[in-house]
A protein has these predicted regions:
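Positively charged, low-complexity nucleic-acid-binding target-recognition regions
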Residues: 1-23, 281-312
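Core catalytic lobe of class I
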Residues: 2-12, 16-267, 272-274
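Conserved SAM-binding loop
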Residues: 277-278
């Protein structure tokens, strides 16, 4: 009887969770992001992650990555203006790109009176042996915001270096420099969750053996680990967070959002990428549902074992 009651309770709980999920806004929409964003109300998004075409002649099924540079910049200005309109006052807008082109976009953002923090995604696992010049090992990410943004630093802390761990608890004398006279002594403190996040994010790209089970047929797919970090840093813990993804592409941001249990709206002009993302989303849902059911079964078995031992 006790087992049956537990099963009934779980069924009710699953039904409530299903109804809650149906009320959530989780959509991947086929269409041009600029036109679709024009249909949305102001100040709706907590987080916006933009991974646009870099104008490097990649094939995304249209000509969006093959424009004259002035035309490309004007196009960027259009979708960025819409993103800023949709962003909440304390929200975060991330824009991926190569530094050489983001520098021009940064100037536009300055003219719009938008605050910007320049982040660097450093990947050290990609190499080009045939290259005859400096090899690229990073991309930049512009973190744009209107007012002081939500920032969950403790959720994205990083691993300490071995040297810092060994020095934990020791006293260090502040060195003389531009901002210090070197007269203050401090301790090497170690936080249980790791070091404070830095503006250089060291996460491998999906190249070689790294992320081979994650990769899909998309030239500029971002790793889930990176997408998750950006979302965790900016998600609103007090109420539902809405993520807007103007360029869905491979769908990595969408998958990360689903795993973080936040709402999302994504736009994608290429129907093949919409199908790809929906397929990844269904696979992710299946894995999570299967794991949840296994956890519930383990929980019931554990409770029954405790009850049995108590009766004895």
């Amino acid at each position: 009887m006790q087992v049956q009651d537990q099963m009934n309770h779980l069924n009710i709980k699953e039904q409530e969770e299903q109804e809650e999920q149906e009320d959530r806004r989780r959509e991947v929409i086929l269409g041009d992001c600029i036109e679709k964003m024009k249909e949305m109300p102001d100040n709706i998004a907590d987080i916006i992650i933009c991974d646009p075409p870099y104008n490097f002649n990649k094939d995304f099924g249209n000509k969006s990555d093959k424009q004259a540079f002035p035309v490309y910049l004007e196009w960027c200005n259009e979708w960025i203006s819409q993103c800023i309109r949709l962003l909440k006052d304390h929200g975060s807008l991330y824009i991926y790109g190569f530094s050489e082109k983001l520098a021009f976009i940064r100037v536009k953002l300055y003219e719009m009176n938008i605050n910007v923090k320049w982040l660097v995604w450093h990947y050290c696992n990609r190499t080009s042996p045939s290259s005859k010049f400096w090899q690229k090992s990073h991309e930049s990410i512009l973190l744009c915001y209107k007012k002081s943004p939500v920032f969950n630093k403790d959720d994205i802390r990083e691993e300490y270096t071995e040297g810092y761990k060994k020095a934990a608890g020791r006293t260090r004398k502040e060195t003389k420099g531009r901002f210090s006279k070197g007269e203050v002594k401090t301790l090497y403190n170690v936080h249980e969750n790791g070091a404070l996040p830095r503006d250089v994010i060291k996460i491998p790209c999906l190249s070689g053996s790294y992320g081979k089970n994650e990769r899909v047929d998309h030239e500029t797919q971002k790793p889930l680990e990176l997408c998750t970090k950006l979302i965790k840093a900016a998600k609103n813990k007090e109420k539902n967070t809405l993520l807007l993804v103007p360029f869905v592409g491979s769908g990595s941001e969408i998958i990360a959002a689903y795993k973080e249990n936040i709402d999302f709206i994504g736009f994608e002009i290429n129907p093949e990428f919409v199908d790809m993302t929906n397929k990844r989303l269904e696979d992710t849902k299946s894995i999570i549902d299967k794991n949840d059911k296994n956890d519930n079964c383990v929980s019931i078995a554990s409770e029954n074992k405790k009850s049995h031992n108590k009766d004895i």
